[in-house]
UniProtKB/Swiss-Prot annotation:
Its main location: virion. Encapsidates the genome in a ratio of one protein N per nine ribonucleotides, protecting it from nucleases. If expressed without protein P it binds non-specifically RNA and therefore can bind it's own mRNA. Interaction with protein P abolishes any non-specific RNA binding, and prevents phosphorylation. The soluble N-P complex encapsidates specifically the genomic RNA, with protein N protecting the genome like a pearl necklace. The encapsidated genomic RNA is termed the nucleocapsid (NC) and serves as template for viral transcription and replication. The keyword Transmembrane does not apply. Homomultimerizes to form the nucleocapsid. Binds to viral genomic RNA. In nucleocapsid, binds protein P and thereby positions the polymerase on the template. Protein P acts as a chaperone on free protein N to prevent it from aggregation before encapsidating genomic RNA. Phosphorylated by host CK2. Unphosphorylated protein N seems to have a better affinity for leader viral promoter encapsidation. Phosphorylation of protein N in ribonucleocapsid may stabilize the interaction with protein P, thereby playing an important role in viral transcription/replication. The keyword Nucleotide-binding does not apply. This is Nucleoprotein. Disulfide bonds: none annotated. SUPFAM superfamilies: Rhabdovirus nucleoprotein-like. The modification Phosphoserine is found at residue 389. InterPro entries: Rhabdo_ncapsid (IPR000448), Rhabdovirus_ncapsid_C (IPR023331), Rhabdovirus_ncapsid_N (IPR023330), Rhabdovirus_nucleoprotein-like (IPR035961). Displays a superantigen activity in human and mouse, activating mostly V-beta-8 subtypes of T-cell receptor.
Length: 450
């Protein structure tokens, strides 16, 4: 008997078959470099930088940029940004540079070149007859890389948000040490013609490379990061949210996870903390793994760890945090149950407020305060643990312990208390809710409750 088969009848005929489904070719892939080779891309023939500058600038002015030419120019222009490595720099076993080495962004990666010439057309006309200066190259590189950031801004941002960002970026790249090379609003006009450039692998790779370089190397032109900073921890919103969460509640990751009372967290926690990743290594390739092409589908995204993501942002909503109210709910990951757990944890960690004296006039006053606090603690421990409880609350020794919180949820039948619902309604009703956001979910789910 084949354990994989099922047997049934169709029109009195016995059928035996093996049910098979499509294999997901797009599974989560952990970023790791196993062959000790730097991340790499292949571009066309290296250009003459003066000719390339004039061509790309004319394309920027005419809103007609050739992505292959732009990538070829950005890679060639890396030579202008030499800096000194402050410490030995290694990642995934690769020595990137030694302390004191002179390096440029292309020291971090391998850029292979073919013999294929670029177009280097002058689409927008060109008055510049002299050769460009280094500040002009730096300004052009900065503006081009900013197209990456602009293309990552979602359409959910209302009003003139994107235009305002583009204008501020232009101001940066017309102020020393940079120099004005385009007219006002050029960046936004050009962006509309290449709004999806964040999906071009080579462009994304170069943006990540520049960002990884400038995030570590002190440099005159470090402000170029304004356009590339979104490549850091890209598609890691689940892991980044968890990191922010444990900082807020002032617990270790291990302590925080003890409060995650739901079976669906198990797979996600295992996924987030896969051994062998350089999640905690400063300046690792891990930080830019998505842009450097080290993973096709991030195991750290909000979709990959949706229950964790939902819980964290429901706690954030309870606190009235705008970022959480604006975040997008992962609808397939038990948002109703996560909102219940989020209410209890929100109340435990933030709702009561923790006020205590932290600063003193002198050491004597500090010691007197600590002695008085110890006496108070001893008295509390000597108490039998019974408390005059409001709102049917349940206390057991340490009221914030995972056991105590879990017991309170069970005593309330796995439902929110009225005080939780009032809090959720008050924070979400005062907020202009974006489509599919946590604020909208809370409004729709709880605003009709008494």
């Amino acid at each position: 008997m084949d354990a994989d088969k099922i047997v049934f009848k169709v029109n009195n005929q016995v059928v035996s078959l093996k049910p098979e489904i499509i294999v997901d070719q797009y599974e989560y892939k952990y970023p790791a470099i196993k062959d000790l080779k730097k991340p790499s891309i292949t571009l066309g023939k290296a250009p003459d930088l003066n000719k390339a500058y004039k061509s790309v600038l004319s394309g920027l002015n005419a809103a007609k940029l050739d992505p292959d030419d732009v990538c070829s120019y950005l890679a060639a222009a890396m030579q202008f940004f030499e800096g000194t490595c402050p410490e030995d720099w290694t990642s995934y076993g690769i020595l990137i540079a030694r302390k004191g080495d002179k390096i440029t962004p292309d020291s971090l990666v391998e850029i292979k070149r073919t013999g294929v010439e670029g177009n280097w057309a002058l689409t927008g006309g060109m008055e510049l007859t002299r050769d460009p200066t280094v500040p002009e190259h730096a300004s052009l590189v900065g503006l081009l890389l900013s197209l990456y950031r602009l293309s990552k801004i979602s359409g959910q941002n209302t009003g003139n948000y994107k235009t305002n960002i583009a204008d501020r970026i232009e101001q940066i790249f017309e102020t020393a040490p940079f120099i004005k090379i385009v007219e006002h609003h050029t960046l936004m006009t050009t962006h509309k013609m290449c709004a999806n450039w964040s999906t071009i692998p080579n462009f994304r790779f170069l943006a990540g490379t520049y960002d990884m370089f400038f995030s570590r190397i002190e440099h005159l032109y470090s402000a170029i990061r304004v356009g590339t900073v979104v490549t850091a921890y890209e598609d890691c919103s689940g892991l980044v949210s968890f990191t922010g969460f444990i900082k807020q509640i002032n617990l270790t990751a291990r302590e925080a996870i003890l409060y995650f009372f739901h079976k669906n967290f198990e797979e996600e926690i295992r996924r987030m903390f896969e051994p062998g990743q350089e999640t905690a290594v400063p300046h690792s390739y891990f930080i830019h793994f998505r842009s450097l092409g080290l993973s096709g589908k991030s195991p750290y995204s909000s979709n990959a760890v949706g229950h964790v993501f939902n819980l964290i942002h429901f706690v954030g909503c309870y606190m009235g945090q705008v970022r959480s109210l604006n975040a997008t709910v992962i609808a397939a990951c038990a948002p109703h149950e996560m909102s219940v757990l989020g209410g209890y944890l929100g109340e435990e960690f933030f709702g009561k407020g923790t006020f205590e004296r932290r600063f003193f006039r002198d050491e004597k006053e500090l010691q007197e305060y600590e002695t008085a606090e110890l006496t108070k603690t001893d008295a509390a421990l000597a108490d039998d643990g019974t408390v005059n409880s409001d709102d049917e609350d349940y206390f057991s020794g340490e009221t914030r312990s995972p056991e105590a919180v879990y017991a309170r949820i069970m005593m309330n039948g796995g439902r929110l208390k009225r005080s939780h619902i009032r809090r959720y309604v008050s924070v979400s009703s005062n907020h202009q809710a974006r489509p599919n956001s946590f604020a909208e979910f809370l409004n729709n789910t709880y605003s009709s409750d008494p």
